[in-house]
UniProtKB/Swiss-Prot annotation:
It comes from the Bacteria. It is an enzyme of class 2 (transferase). This is Ribosomal protein L11 methyltransferase. Its main location: cytoplasm. The keyword Lipid biosynthesis does not apply. The lineage of its organism: Bacteria, Bacillati, Cyanobacteriota, Cyanophyceae, Oscillatoriophycideae. CDD domains: AdoMet_MTases. It catalyses: L-lysyl-[protein] + 3 S-adenosyl-L-methionine = N(6),N(6),N(6)-trimethyl-L-lysyl-[protein] + 3 S-adenosyl-L-homocysteine + 3 H(+). S-adenosyl-L-methionine binds at residues 139, 163, 185, 232.
């Protein structure tokens, strides 16, 4: 049964999606995908049978319930079944279709042929096991914010993408006109996915520089400072990094932050204010929000 995989299905409140993705990634799953069923989300993920016992799956189910209770959301329902390897390779992909985002962008799965008769910016993507297919509200909010921001900026900009996942935000930024993006993620699979998607979108590696690590590695990697930051990760991780944003950015820099539930917005805003950042706009979608912030130049 070495070629068999567990297909894990999590039925959950849509506002739990990012937390479930994070938990499945930490558990070791690959090829995550989401579809909407009524008022709920169904998240599918896959893990080799040889590495995972039934007790492990039961523990995963418990952790997912605990994660939901911490944010006062309904308990998710987790189920699993064994499938053959060839079924795994195609099963999750059939649920992911092209996604239009903002006024100018469309996310196209790598295994589909993109249109040639469109003025839209096409971001081709194969996320592998990394987070970021463009279907989650936080990813969409970040891309829409980037579209607005990079349309406003007449001068070439250099950005930092902290927690790059599949590379979707970095690639979107380059295709929207950013001159250079430095992308980091602590997960080596995310680093690999971002590099693969960089190649898929024919982006020069000198324009999108990808490394394993977090903000500390960026501070060592970047010669000088960046014009902007984009960061779509868990709110508590963002909170811990805010004090380091100043050293990373120029005096008139901006940042786009998401992965944040509405109920987490106030502590994030308070921490930003303590470190001389101004909230220019707070965009909301469902129970998620996206901070558009700038340095306080006064």
């Amino acid at each position: 049964m070495a070629n068999s995989w567990w297909e894990i299905q999590v039925l959950c409140d849509p506002n739990l999606e990012e937390s479930v993705f994070w938990r499945l990634d930490k558990f070791g799953c690959s090829g995550t995908a989401t579809e909407i069923k009524g008022q709920s989300s169904v998240i599918k993920a896959y893990i080799p049978q040889i590495t995972t016992q039934l007790l492990d799956l039961a523990a995963l189910s418990l952790w997912l319930i605990q994660d939901a209770l911490l944010v006062n959301l309904p308990r998710p329902i987790t189920r699993w079944r064994l499938i053959d390897e060839e079924d795994w390779a195609s099963s999750w992909k059939q649920h992911w279709q092209p996604t239009e985002i903002g006024d100018r962008m469309i996310i196209y799965p790598a295994w589909l042929t993109p249109p040639t008769d469109t003025d839209q910016i096409i971001i081709r993507l194969d996320p592998g096991s990394a987070f970021g297919t463009g279907t989650h509200a936080t990813t969409q909010l970040c891309l829409e914010s980037l579209e607005m921001r990079l349309t406003m900026d007449a001068e070439p900009v250099t950005l930092a993408d902290i927690g790059c996942g599949s590379g979707i935000l970095s690639i979107g930024a380059i295709l929207l006109g950013a001159q250079k993006v430095y992308a980091v993620d602590t997960d080596p699979l995310a680093v690999s996915a971002t590099r693969s998607n960089r190649h898929l979108n024919e982006i020069d590696p000198n324009h999108l520089i990808v490394n394993q690590g977090s903000i500390e590695q960026l501070l060592d990697l970047i010669p000088g400072q960046v014009d902007g930051i984009v960061c779509n990760i868990l709110a508590e991780v963002i909170m811990d990094m805010i004090p380091q944003f100043t050293a990373l950015t120029k005096p008139k820099s901006w940042a786009i932050l998401s992965g944040i539930l509405l109920e987490q917005a106030k502590p994030i805003a308070d921490t930003l204010e303590q470190h001389d950042w101004v909230v220019a706009a707070l965009w909301k979608r469902g129970d998620w929000c996206c901070f558009n912030i700038r340095k306080n130049s006064d």
